[in-house]
């Protein structure tokens, strides 16, 4: 199930102090790792960033009252399934969380809304209900991630467009 990422860069123990304050858009090192794992598992970068922002606000030390932990807020059972040893490890959490998201994207044939809903509440529930899920928490979560996803797409487009008179 787990695919080893053969990039030497991932062997570094990301040196982010526990007291580092997360920023809404994420620390550049965290974004770098998130993008690299997104590329490795074939998941859109903007979707990964949107989920991380929604789940933990880019805080690798986040812990929910339900026991979800780390950047992608992995529950213990999901972490075990994806061989995540330390849910607070940036690399472990991103690798396991993004691989899980990639599996959900495959399970739901690329339908992002369903994959995001399943990321939030589990694939069994969404597989049974499909687009007919009515739980207000799930609907709200999917809408929040969709909004963040759109912001990520626009931010990326803004970065990719050269300023007039520069770089042309």
Can you say where each PLM-predicted feature lies in the sequence?
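Positively charged n-region of N-terminal signal peptides that target proteins for export
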Residues: 1-4
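Sec/Tat signal peptide C-region and signal peptidase I cleavage site
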Residues: 16-20
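Catalytic glycan-binding domains that act on GlcNAc-containing polysaccharides
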Residues: 21-168
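Bacterial N-terminal signal peptides
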Residues: 6-15
């Amino acid at each position: 199930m787990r695919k080893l990422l053969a990039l030497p860069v991932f062997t570094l123990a990301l040196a982010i102090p526990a007291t580092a304050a997360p920023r809404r858009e994420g620390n550049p090192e965290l974004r770098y790792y998130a993008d690299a794992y997104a590329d490795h598992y074939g998941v859109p970068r903007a979707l990964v960033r949107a989920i991380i922002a929604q789940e933990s606000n880019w805080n690798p030390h986040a812990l929910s009252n339900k026991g979800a932990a780390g950047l992608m807020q992995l529950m213990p059972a999901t972490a075990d399934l994806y061989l995540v040893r330390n849910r607070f490890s940036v690399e472990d959490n991103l690798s396991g969380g993004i691989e899980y998201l990639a599996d959900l994207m495959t399970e739901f044939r690329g339908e992002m809304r369903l994959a995001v809903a399943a990321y939030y509440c589990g694939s069994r529930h969404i597989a049974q209900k499909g687009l007919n899920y009515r739980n207000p928490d799930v609907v709200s979560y999917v809408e929040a991630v969709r909004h963040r996803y759109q912001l990520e797409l626009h931010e990326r487009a803004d970065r990719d467009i050269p300023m007039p008179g520069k770089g042309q």
